[in-house]
Structures are given as structure tokens and as C-alpha cells.
């Protein structure tokens, strides 16, 4: 089990280094010199989440960060994170954040404005 923990932590390190770029379980498994099935197995046994769930979690965090804190266009964000097209990026974002990328950015911008107004008062 020690080996599984080590591989899992290497996987998490790779996720962090990729900064949320959407990549397949197969790609990460190849980098770790193991099979995708084994990567998912150790991920689930060590953390309770599959490798794909971890990949998606890191991708969602990156999407949130870009939409909240950058002026990049939606297309630039999708490209930077490795999505094949805007449609897939939009569906992925809506699935995980509940709204489209444009709507999420608008909501975050409104929250920021409200906070700024309250801090000035």
C-alpha cells in the first residue's frame, strides 16, 4: 500500500503541475508508467475518488480561477485548458458549475462589485 500512496501523490503532483489542463487518465498513467485501470484503482483506494474525478476537480478549480481572476476570453480559457472546442467547454462548465462560463463570470463579477460597495461604506 506504500507504493500506492506514493503513486497517488505523484499523480496529484502531476495534476498540480498541469494547472488544470484537461488530460486523460491514460496520459497520467503513462507518465507514471502504470495502466489507467491501476491508476484509477489506487486513486479510489487511497482517496475515495477515481482518477477522472480528481482530473475534473483540478480542471473545475482552474476554470473558476480563470473566470474569476482573468480577462481571458472564454475561448482562450478553453484553449489554455486543452478543451477540444467551445461547445465541450461550455457543457463541461455547466455540468460542474451549474451555469455557462459566461454566466459564471457575470455572477462572480456581480459578487465582486457588491463586496466592493460594502467595503467602501
Regions found by a protein language model. Give the residues of each.
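Basic, amphipathic alpha-helical hairpins
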Residues: 10-24, 43, 47, 64-73, ...
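Basic/polar phosphate-binding segments, predominantly the helix-turn-helix DNA-binding elements
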Residues: 22, 26-58, 78-103
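Terminal helix-turn-helix DNA-binding modules in bacterial transcription factors
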Residues: 45-84, 106-121
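Polybasic "coupling" helices that flank or enter modular domains
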Residues: 1-15, 19-20, 33-36
